[in-house]
Amino acid sequence: MIKSTAEVRQAFLDFFATKQHQIVKSSSLVPGNDATLLFTNAGMVPFKDVFLGAETRSYTRATSAQRCVRAGGKHNDLENVGYTARHHTFFEMMGNFSFGDYFKNDAISYAWEFLTGELGLAKEKLLVTVYATDEEAFSYWRDEVGVPEDKIIRIGDKSANKKYESDNFWSMGDTGPCGPCSEIFYDHGEDIFGGPPGSPDEDGDRFIEIWNIVFMQFNRQSDGRMDPLPNPSIDTGMGLERISAIMQNVHSNYEIDIFQALIKDTAALLDCSDLEHKSLRVIGDHIRSCSFLIVDGVVPSNEGRGYVLRRIIRRAIRHGHKLEATGHFFHKLVASLIAQMGEAYPELAQQQAIIEKLLRIEEEQFGRTLDRGMILLEDILANLSGDIIKGDDVFKLYDTYGFPADLTADIARERNLKIDKDGFDVAMKQQRERAQQASQFGTDYNQQLKSDQNTAFKGYDNDSYSATVVELFNSQDQDPVSQLNSGEQGIVILDHTPFYAESGGQVGDSGLLHLDGGVFEVTDTIKLGNAFAHRGTAHTDVGLNRRVKAEINVERRAAIVKNHTATHLLHEALRKVLGEHVTQKGSLCDSDKLRFDFSHFEGVTAQELHDVEQMVNNEIRRNHAKQTESMYIEEAKAKGAMALFGEKYDDEVRVVTLGDFSIELCGGVHVNRTGDIGFLKIVSESGIAAGVRRIEAVTGTGALDFINQQTASLTTIAALVKSDVTNASSKVELLISRSKQLEKEIGQLKQELAAQAGSDLVNNTIEINGVKVLIADLGSVESKALRGMVDELKNKMQSGVIMLATANGPKVGLIAGVTKDLVGRVKAGDLVNMVAQQVGGKGGGRPDMAQAGGSQPENITSALESVSAWLTEKLA
């Protein structure tokens, strides 16, 4: 009998495979090429472009178990995770999809057959909902499937004046594909509170939605018109954790096998005997989302996806401390997760070391401030009037101790308190932006430039090719046109082309389209679905069905492909030198340089860069022949071919192999042999985000030019220091050492002169209420000499108050000194701050010694004149 979570997952995929569905592996939690989404949060996300008509697949039926995260933007379930039966940051969404193939009746039949046939659920335990006006779905459920009419609930719009705003009507955005949906609910029994969907008690836990079937049959226009789609599609989703709970005869998702194992392992690690403690649930959930996010290349940071990951990690750590965890514990749970999910997701075991390392680093960083932050929070709570923590206090906890606002909200919730979220947002406004992206597709998809054409790429073996113009667009309004007139900018789509369209980091080709009477100058080439769009300017009239000779800029292409092939070598060299955790995070290969972004959590040392560069150049000298072949993607991955971040691949892929050194999935254009690159020179290495490094490099003549520039600079430096090139570095080191020594000697002399000047100042003391007081403007004496001067003066005066000022350019330096017998009457910090405020600054320090700065030297005289009156009052 199907029971375990792993069995349910496999049974679902196997069932739909028998219904001619292609099993599609879960895509990354980081949506490829989709800036509108923070994370993959639904099973249909990888197929979004297919539903929109911007991408085609080799299949029209698909099924998947998609990893999802909901912990940011609109879908932020974080504060509820652990406290309810079904909220998670990470979950798996089972789905079956039809891209213009089967529709409503088959989708309903398949769902019912799987639930009642394969899983054996009792039919009387199930009820369904349909959109109020969807008679087709209602009739099929009743007449063909046999669901009693009283078990089919019609769900209408949420309000009369908001048509199609319903729990049973799904939209991709304000415009674009949409349609009614039908949901299947499971009745957990009368002993659990709650009513059926549509009833006043629908938010109870008795009736739980387990499957949603979306019928994409309309295209909503900007004026609200609903046009029927020519090829209606199906998008379904069933939460694996929810259906597993039913199969294991438990009510809460946290009671299923995967979570129980994680909870028990966490309890054992933390010596917690209460297996029902909600903090164990929180930690069990969070180790899943954190581990899978790191697998997909997300690293903790202070913005975007990395900040969401950091929030989840810190929430887990805080709940560990609630359970009196000692030491670092969270990273130790990765092994437990692998034991539960490693078979379905082998990438967990493959990246275990990097997951554990990143979690431990984050634990260490947060652990240093957690206890101090909790002390501050307890102090805030002790002085709280009312039940709302002020936004400024929430911000202070965030800014000083790294407490995300939702972590503070979590703690407040446990004590029946709330936070002033609006006040926190105001305080955050001038701070670093955090990614709070909406998870709906908020674009008008009907306005996106689209083409239904298919361009055959001939550029692997041809620099020029004869072709026919099959589509034209005007650049100004991006409308399809029948002709581009001479002088107009636009887009030309051909049936065949040698022009490479920008993809995988390789820029698009430029060149000319030759026509009778003139040319179309191509400045860039991009993809529009399966069409290659040649962007540029017409220098003659270009009409549909015209024949052209498409000719790329050969010299530019040659420079681009050198950088592209070198990028493959660089990627592999980095993995060999730094470790297998290195993955591509982005790249650019143009005619001038290559830029490669990769995952690595610390700076690359000079020696490591040297080793990488030397390894790449060794492979260039080995002059490997480029080999390309097409194969199924799973076969390619089995051979060790690397798939690149953010790229989408068809079932059949092109594999580029460079000797025994590099093998990658790649549709780009390359040199024939690695020796064609010439050599590679790394120009720079830097960090561009937390956990992401960037290397820029040049190849071929670009590398030669760079070396020549470096050599010329070195020759100039050698001449300046009167040395030859060979000994220039030693001579420069000697000069730097001598310069530092001279600076040190000059500093000592200045301090001695200042001390002497200070001794002379003793004669300028005055008395205020029987206390010796010295107030002086020292002109341009260096600020760092002031402290020693004050110590010397205090020793000579034995009892007294000192206030000194100095100015160097626009910078003001202030220092106040008070002998210990007088600090009960005058505080040096108060004195220096009073003066500093008058010269555009502020400062503070100990009661006996305090320093400050300022930016208004013109006010020094008047500020010092105010000291006597201030001291007269203090010393009264």
Swiss-Prot record:
It comes from the Bacteria. Consists of three domains; the N-terminal catalytic domain, the editing domain and the C-terminal C-Ala domain. The editing domain removes incorrectly charged amino acids, while the C-Ala domain, along with tRNA(Ala), serves as a bridge to cooperatively bring together the editing and aminoacylation centers thus stimulating deacylation of misacylated tRNAs. SUPFAM superfamilies: Class II aaRS and biotin synthetases (SSF55681), Putative anticodon-binding domain of alanyl-tRNA synthetase (AlaRS) (SSF101353), ThrRS/AlaRS common domain (SSF55186), Translation proteins (SSF50447). Binds 1 zinc ion per subunit. Signal peptide: none annotated. Belongs to the class-II aminoacyl-tRNA synthetase family. It catalyses: tRNA(Ala) + L-alanine + ATP = L-alanyl-tRNA(Ala) + AMP + diphosphate. One of its GO terms (cellular component) is cytosol. It is found in: Cytoplasm. It is an enzyme of class 6 (ligase). It holds the Pfam family tRNA_SAD. SMART domains: tRNA_SAD (SM00863). This is Alanine--tRNA ligase. Catalyzes the attachment of alanine to tRNA(Ala) in a two-step reaction: alanine is first activated by ATP to form Ala-AMP and then transferred to the acceptor end of tRNA(Ala). Also edits incorrectly charged Ser-tRNA(Ala) and Gly-tRNA(Ala) via its editing domain. Its EC number is 6.1.1.7. One of its GO terms (biological process) is negative regulation of DNA-templated transcription. Keywords: Aminoacyl-tRNA synthetase, ATP-binding, Cytoplasm, Ligase, Metal-binding, Nucleotide-binding, Protein biosynthesis, RNA-binding, tRNA-binding, Zinc. InterPro entries: aa-tRNA-synth_II/BPL/LPL, Ala-tRNA-lgiase_IIc, Ala-tRNA-ligase_IIc_anticod-bd, Ala-tRNA-synth_IIc_core, Ala-tRNA-synth_IIc_N, Ala-tRNA_ligase, Ala_tRNA_ligase_euk/bac, DHHA1_dom. GO terms for molecular function: alanine-tRNA ligase activity; aminoacyl-tRNA deacylase activity; ATP binding; tRNA binding; zinc ion binding. Its cofactor is Zn(2+). Zn(2+) binds at H564, H568, C666, H670. Its main location: cytoplasm.
